[in-house]
């Protein structure tokens, strides 16, 4: 018997009856070069390479000194920032519990809570010059519903950035294509000097995700 009181043999039997979708996911993970590289490089997720690639294209981390990572778990993006900008202050926030990362302050809370902006600014000892978000809502399998749920998060993250960034700062976020993208771009263009988007090579080919990079915050 295991510590949970369940017969391990039954778990093996269940594993053999994996759904086709979970089997495909497992096979994809096992054959994914980014997953293998993440393990070799010590990153917690393959998403780390998306930030590395986006930084190479847009210089997102150049000069960053106070960074907020919204939805930090499991921590791959924060690890990249820590490696590229070792002297930067980094604060991550997530509803999920996140394993500690050396040099990173992690707050387990809702970034949309009223007290979140002040708490993050206090932890950074000043306003952030980079707010980044790799968040996506839990999917339900309905493309438009998944799009709207994630875009709701992205828009909330954008407003968080607008309310907290120092002048000249940068906002980076994951977006799911699906119809309301233009509303987000319109919002960002009214608050940032340049707004660009890209799909980094590390994004899976079949994914509808892309990333928006808004630079040169105009101030409040």
UniProtKB/Swiss-Prot annotation:
Location of region: Disordered: 1-24
Keywords in alphabetical order: Cytoplasm, Methyltransferase, rRNA processing, S-adenosyl-L-methionine, Transferase
Family annotation (Pfam families): FtsJ
Active-site residues annotated for this sequence: 174 (proton acceptor)
Broad class of enzyme this protein falls into: transferase
InterPro entries (UniProt xref): RNA_methyltr_RlmE (IPR050082), RNA_MeTrfase_FtsJ_dom (IPR002877), rRNA-MeTfrase_E (IPR015507), SAM-dependent_MTases_sf (IPR029063)
Record field: compositional bias (Basic and acidic residues): 1-10
Name this polypeptide is given: Ribosomal RNA large subunit methyltransferase E
Taxonomic classification: Bacteria, Pseudomonadati, Pseudomonadota, Alphaproteobacteria, Sphingomonadales
